[in-house]
């Protein structure tokens, strides 16, 4: 019997709706990965509602919880760590300490960093110290880096001017440590405005993918968290980088189709769960010559 992968997901959690672990955990479980959720915050709802209640986990609790898993002899079974939104650089350093602890007992474990800073419409949404931590520390430790366009631009200190420029910038990030860069949402000048574009860059090749851009009165939150989680899960299940890339684009599109059909602000993960497991659509990644 094939072993089921185990993944430690360190990010935010909301009681109502879907963001952070609340957007990623169930879909990863649905496709066959055991997820260990470590919630860095517990809020009533995501912050785009404008008001929320809840509290942030003390940074010292992160390595303490990782050590607790070690104490029962299970830490070596962890195949990957996923991190998302950070409330502080101290929290980020605590996560990297946990990653280091896991890699000490399982050197094959992967670390996916979703370097949440913001997006093109809203700009940067994290403190400067978090941006600096992601640039100076997290990139070097990540095996997989999943920025959006704003985050790619922030890492490289300039705005991308074309698709080829995005590839060059991603390759520059690979020189700092990661094995692969997945740009979850491209927003370079001159792109096709009615398509949602993504980019996958490894040390050897690059791939570009387009899917239809769906319109919403209010853009659902948690799409990036869902994307990062599904990509990592499929890699753990044995997909190649490109297979995981194509699957993720299709599965996320299925969730958005269901969300749009329900006229919902929150991602319709439960209603779309069978389509997450078995997407009906397929988007083929095009290998780039540059």
UniProtKB/Swiss-Prot annotation:
This is Pyridoxal kinase PdxY. CDD domains: pyridoxal_pyridoxamine_kinase. Belongs to the pyridoxine kinase family. PdxY subfamily. ATP binds at residues 114, 151, 184, 211-214. Substrate binds at residues 12, 47-48, 225. InterPro entries: PM/HMP-P_kinase-1 (IPR013749), PyrdxlKinase (IPR004625), Pyridoxal_kinase_PdxY (IPR023685), Ribokinase-like (IPR029056). One of its GO terms (molecular function) is magnesium ion binding. GO terms for biological process: pyridoxal 5'-phosphate salvage. Pyridoxal kinase involved in the salvage pathway of pyridoxal 5'-phosphate (PLP). Catalyzes the phosphorylation of pyridoxal to PLP. Coiled coil: none annotated. Its cofactor is Mg(2+). Its EC number is 2.7.1.35. It comes from Pseudomonas putida (strain W619). Keywords: ATP-binding, Kinase, Magnesium, Nucleotide-binding, Transferase.
């Amino acid at each position: 019997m094939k072993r089921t992968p185990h993944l430690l997901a360190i990010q935010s959690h909301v009681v109502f709706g879907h963001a952070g672990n609340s957007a990623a955990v169930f879909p990863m479980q649905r496709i066959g990965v055991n997820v260990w959720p470590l919630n860095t915050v517990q809020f009533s709802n995501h912050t785009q509602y404008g008001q929320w209640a809840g509290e942030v986990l003390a940074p010292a609790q992160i390595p303490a919880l990782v050590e607790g898993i070690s104490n029962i002899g299970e830490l070596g079974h962890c195949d990957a760590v996923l991190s998302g939104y950070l409330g502080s650089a101290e929290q980020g350093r605590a996560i990297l300490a946990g990653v280091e602890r896991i890699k000490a007992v399982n050197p094959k474990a992967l670390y996916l960093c979703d370097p949440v800073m913001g997006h093109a419409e809203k700009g940067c949404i994290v403190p400067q110290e978090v941006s600096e931590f992601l640039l100076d520390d997290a990139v070097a430790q990540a095996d997989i880096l999943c920025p959006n366009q704003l985050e790619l631009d922030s890492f490289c200190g300039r705005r991308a001017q074309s698709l080829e420029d995005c590839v060059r910038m991603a390759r520059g990030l690979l020189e700092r440590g990661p094995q692969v860069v997945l740009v979850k949402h491209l927003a370079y000048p001159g792109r096709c405005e009615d398509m949602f574009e993504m980019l996958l860059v490894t040390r050897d090749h690059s791939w570009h993918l387009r899917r239809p851009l769906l319109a919403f009165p209010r853009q659902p939150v948690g799409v990036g968290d869902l994307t990062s989680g599904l990509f990592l899960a499929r890699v753990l299940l044995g997909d190649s980088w490109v297979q995981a890339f194509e699957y993720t684009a299709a599965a996320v599109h299925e969730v958005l189709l269901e969300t749009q059909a329900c006229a919902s602000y929150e991602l319709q993960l439960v209603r779309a769960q069978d389509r997450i497991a078995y997407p009906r659509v397929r988007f083929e990644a095009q290998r780039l010559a540059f």
